[in-house]
Curated annotation (Swiss-Prot):
Organism ancestry: Bacteria, Pseudomonadati, Pseudomonadota, Betaproteobacteria, Burkholderiales
Organism: Burkholderia pseudomallei (strain K96243)
SMART domains referenced in this protein's UniProt entry, alphabetically: BHL
Protein name: DNA-binding protein HU-alpha
Pfam families xref list: Bac_DNA_binding
One MF annotation (Gene Ontology) recorded for this entry: structural constituent of chromatin
Entry annotated with the keyword DNA-binding: yes
Keyword DNA-binding: yes
Function according to Swiss-Prot or TrEMBL: Histone-like DNA-binding protein which is capable of wrapping DNA to stabilize it, and thus to prevent its denaturation under extreme environmental conditions.
Coiled-coil segments: none
Subunit structure: Heterodimer of an alpha and a beta chain.
Gene3D superfamilies referenced in this protein's UniProt entry, alphabetically: IHF-like DNA-binding proteins (4.10.520.10)
Protein family according to the UniProt entry: Belongs to the bacterial histone-like protein family.
Amino acid sequence: MNKQELIDAVAAQTGASKAQTGETLDTLLEVIKKAVSKGDSVQLIGFGSFGSGKRAARTGRNPKTGETIKIPAAKTVKFTAGKAFKDAVNKR
């Protein structure tokens, strides 16, 4: 399912317009991005939580040339599925 299909499905279930649903989804995603970018976590009970982590700098190797390269430290995005979401996927 892509973003437009998600918008269509939510609009059909809620009776809201597709434009309104699309705007709401865009706003929701923007709020999550801003919070996680600041280092906060976003917890949606029953669904999961979004957060950020840190990956330390490390040494890597170019598989083509065998040359050793330095990989800089980076922030990562993490999503942890909630129990209810996992159970729904596994149909427990």
